[in-house]
Amino acid sequence: MSYENLANLIFPNIDKTPEYYFEKYPKRDLKEGAKVLRYAPSPTGFQHIGGVFASLINERLAHQSGGIFYLRIEDTDQKREVEGAIDDTIKTMHNFGMDFDEGITGENSEKGAYAPYKQSQRADIYRAFVKDLLRKGLAYPCFMTSEELEALREKQIAEKLTPGCYGEFAKYRDLSPEEAIKRIEAGENYVIRMKSPGNPEKRVVAHDMIKGEVSFPENLQDVVIIKGDGLPTYHFAHAIDDTLMRTTHVIRGEEWLSSLPIHLQMFEVLGVEAPKYAHIPTIMKMDGSSKRKLSKRKDPESAVSYYSEKGYPSQSVIEYLLNIINSAFEEWRAENPDADYHDYKVELDKMSKSGALFDLVKLNDVSKDVICKMKPEVVYDLYTNWAKEYDKEMYDLVTSKEAMMKEVFNIDKEGPKPRKDFAKWDEVREKIFYFFDELFDKETANDVELPKTLELEEAKRIIEAYEKAYNFNTDKDTWFSDLKEVAVELGYATDRKKYKKNPEEYKGMVSDVAGAVRAALTHRANTPDLYTIMQIMGEEAVRERFKKFLAL
């Protein structure tokens, strides 16, 4: 009865057993092959792109299998908790199209039959399992002080031994329950450690769903499972929570791979089946000619807020991350340009085993493709939602001309090679400013981008001539014929072959004349279709722009 007495002394108010909790949280009634996965952040800061990356993998694997994706908050380190971090997590994942089937729904709310989903509210559950281990002699109170532990560590390092509390160095491992009871009753501080059954001669071999077979020496450490403050360590809480919440697969960063022997051993000691594990590669970026880990401190793109501020549509970020998760996604997208990305099946065994390279240039390419396929009404809604928060002037201007802006967002969208003007919403202002006199009139002659073959005075001569010939009420072919007539009158070639054969006979090409008109109306050399721009602006605005150009 000594172990029983020790367990009751440490946890006098814990009357539930592991069997009670196994019955309370039964196996989930899901179809065969359905996976149960979780996103389990600590509320110690705001979300970063690595969290979205990990969450996306978990969400896709769960939902594409007809399973469950839940949110658990691992808040045992409450000293580091940041106010608002939980709501930020929920909002971020929702904005990226990932909603949780169960778990935490707000700072003080949750849903699901496996509650509570906050570790800080599960203390009695952990204590029930620790009490059971104490009863069975599989765990023990350790009274080593921090000074003793530090001295032990220094001694072990000096002797080139593995530092830690194990074997002969586990001072209180074999302490009798009676002696432990005396020390506790005397008021000594302690933690609770699990007795490791590890053998230094053996290795643990496991299957990682990304890396394949992995092998490590068995864990020898008597790891702490309950800290001095009575809360569990991450290792122990993880094992209990994933067991009771019936998690089938744990997808986490490869920095946790070295902890796998500890976690597998815990499941063994607890007498329960371990979930399957996959350790995803760290997100890297190029720094000169070498790769390094994406840094919260150095790289603004590591923060999720960066993508909101710049105006990347959430779908663009998701599609780019799917490219990182499975390189085959790019080929699938090319073959299925209009399919929903949810139709793509993520496969862990096809994921890169080395660091996932994050490339903003590639993200921009993906985002241009995503925006290009959007209906103008969708572009308008997404852009104005962004501008309302990040560019109030543009929000006021664009919403004051909603119908016109939907036409603008549809320019050159419906042909076989649609334009890809925007990768993110903060680029829109520069690409459409000329539709608004309030912005256009701030420009000076120095801002005008003329064709390289033209000086400003020659461009003005072109506009003087074209203004007289300009007819708003024509179709595109007639409009271009009129433009060519003006070009011929002014000495510009309309036939490229003739121009190349005798360039000295011409001032330039008809494209230079069109370039002058484009510059007068937009001040830019590269814009969407000029005829369409003029039709959207309207005759009065076009003629007014010609006057302004001639006055430069």
From Swiss-Prot:
A motif ('KMSKS' region) lies at residues 293-297. InterPro entries: aa-tRNA-synth_I_cd-bd, aa-tRNA-synth_I_codon-bd_sub2, aa_tRNA-synth_I_cd-bd_sf, Glu-tRNA-ligase_bac/mito, Glu/Gln-tRNA-synth, Glu/Gln-tRNA-synth_Ib_cat-dom, GluQ/Sye, GluRS_core. It catalyses: tRNA(Glu) + L-glutamate + ATP = L-glutamyl-tRNA(Glu) + AMP + diphosphate. One of its GO terms (biological process) is glutamyl-tRNA aminoacylation. One of its GO terms (cellular component) is cytosol. Keywords: Aminoacyl-tRNA synthetase, ATP-binding, Cytoplasm, Ligase, Nucleotide-binding, Protein biosynthesis. The keyword ATP-binding applies. It is found in: Cytoplasm. The keyword Ligase applies. Catalyzes the attachment of glutamate to tRNA(Glu) in a two-step reaction: glutamate is first activated by ATP to form Glu-AMP and then transferred to the acceptor end of tRNA(Glu). Belongs to the class-I aminoacyl-tRNA synthetase family. Glutamate--tRNA ligase type 1 subfamily. This is Glutamate--tRNA ligase. It comes from Clostridium perfringens (strain SM101 / Type A). The gene is gltX.
